[in-house]
UniProtKB/Swiss-Prot annotation:
Name of the protein in question: D-alanine--D-alanine ligase
Catalytic activity annotation: 2 D-alanine + ATP = D-alanyl-D-alanine + ADP + phosphate + H(+)
Entry binding sites for Mg(2+) 2: 325, 327
Record's keyword terms, sorted: ATP-binding, Cell shape, Cell wall biogenesis/degradation, Cytoplasm, Ligase, Magnesium, Manganese, Metal-binding, Nucleotide-binding, Peptidoglycan synthesis
Transmembrane segments: none
Domain of life the protein comes from: Bacteria
GO cellular component assignments: cytosol
Organism name: Rhodococcus opacus (strain B4)
Annotated GO MF terms: ATP binding; D-alanine-D-alanine ligase activity; metal ion binding
Pfam families: Dala_Dala_lig_C, Dala_Dala_lig_N
Pathway noted in the entry: Cell wall biogenesis; peptidoglycan biosynthesis
Length: 368
């Protein structure tokens, strides 16, 4: 008798400005979950926050030219019950079917990027509901989403980070003293965002206020960081079902030669639309530097109390590696660096997502 398949809810879309990236990531996950092992229940969240039963066709979640996918409200409306005695039940909301159990899932893969998904909110819901899920828990997800608290936790562990200033709501701009501690160029970012959305490279102080206003269209709290001269690299961290935590090879992102100052960082279009960046997987680094980065990535994973997975971004400077950010639900598109780094060490995409699901099931929910 064959073993029953594990029912996996893949949740994507969401209310954040990374909605479309989440959809593309989910399409790749759907494409690579082994149908002999898993029964997939796709759940889309619209930009307004409605939950609907999605399509199992991954092509519906692909980038077409420069057109990005999104979740519409055409599917059957549903909700996940927060009652742990009915763990995993998906309840219909549409008239005529309200209250009907559409499915009961064993584990959730929340392929959500940004606010209302990657920031601890859905992780809290899943903990309340008693449903195992892929990725870090509430604390790590919330801390990893907020660049202010990410760096505070990393600094507390003695990990190398760059200098930043936090502009809270109501603080219009930098003081003269803060400007003197930063050095141009600076990067102005939404404090709780990803996919390089809302980021501006500022080469002269006259452009600062416009950059702050641009970032505040995405988040009332803004980060201003000193630019760091160095090579931009990334490292993946993966937890296995037995609790072993490993780091991947290092990947380097290189902007094309001749890019002007306004294009010389890895922004949203460079990541998903323009195909202008060049990548080295693995990065061409001295073995000692690669080993140091991999060790720092695992330490950062531990500092935030992550589980499951993370991607840690670095600059390699003349004085050594500096941690830039940690991403607790990295992109899972076909071109995303996280799956590419693991593929380079023999963990292909299908094995990667299976490992993540198996780790989530082994971990369970609750205090741990």
């Amino acid at each position: 008798m064959s073993k029953p398949r594990t029912r996996v809810a893949v949740i994507f879309g969401g209310r954040s400005n990374e909605h479309s990236v989440s959809c593309v990531s989910a399409g790749s996950v759907l494409r690579n979950l082994d149908p002999e092992r898993y029964e997939v229940v796709p759940i889309g969240i619209t930009t307004e926050g409605s939950w609907v039963l999605g399509s199992t066709d991954p092509e519906s979640l692909s980038i077409r030219g420069r057109s990005l996918p999104s979740v519409d409200a055409d599917g059957s409306a549903l909700a996940l019950t927060a009652d742990p005695t009915r763990s995993g039940d998906l309840v219909a909301l549409d008239d005529g079917e309200a209250g009907k159990i559409l499915a009961s899932v064993d584990v959730v893969f929340p392929v959500l990027h940004g606010a209302y998904g990657e920031d601890g909110t859905i992780q809290g819901l899943l903990e309340l509901a008693g449903v195992p899920y892929v990725g870090p828990g509430v604390l790590a997800s919330a801390a990893g989403m907020d660049k202010e608290f990410t760096k505070k936790l990393l600094a507390a562990e003695g990990l190398p980070i760059g200098f930043q200033v936090v502009l809270r709501p109501g603080t219009a701009t930098l003081t003269d003293e803060q400007r003197s501690r930063l050095h141009l160029p600076v990067f102005v970012k939404p404090a709780r965002g990803g996919s390089s959305i809302g980021i501006t490279r500022v080469a002269e102080w006259a452009a600062l206020d416009d950059a702050i206003a641009h970032a505040r269209r995405h988040d009332p709290k803004v980060i201003v960081e000193s630019g760091i001269a160095g090579r931009e690299v990334e490292c993946g961290v993966l937890e296995f079902p037995d609790g072993d935590v490993r780091a991947s090879v290092i990947a380097e992102i290189r902007m094309p030669e001749g890019a002007d100052d306004d294009e010389a960082f890895y922004d949203f279009d460079s990541k998903y639309l323009d195909d202008v960046c060049e990548f080295d997987v693995p990065a061409k680094l001295e073995d000692s530097v690669s080993d140091e980065i991999r060790a720092l990535a695992v330490r950062a994973f531990s500092a935030l109390d992550c589980q499951g997975l993370a991607r840690v971004d670095f600059f390699v400077t003349e004085d050594g590696p500096v941690i830039n950010e940690i991403n607790t639900m990295p992109g899972f598109t076909s071109i995303s660096m996280y799956p590419r780094m693991w593929d380079a060490v023999g963990v292909d995409y299908g094995t990667l997502v299976s490992t993540l699901v198996d780790t989530a099931l082994a971990r369970g929910t609750g205090l741990r």
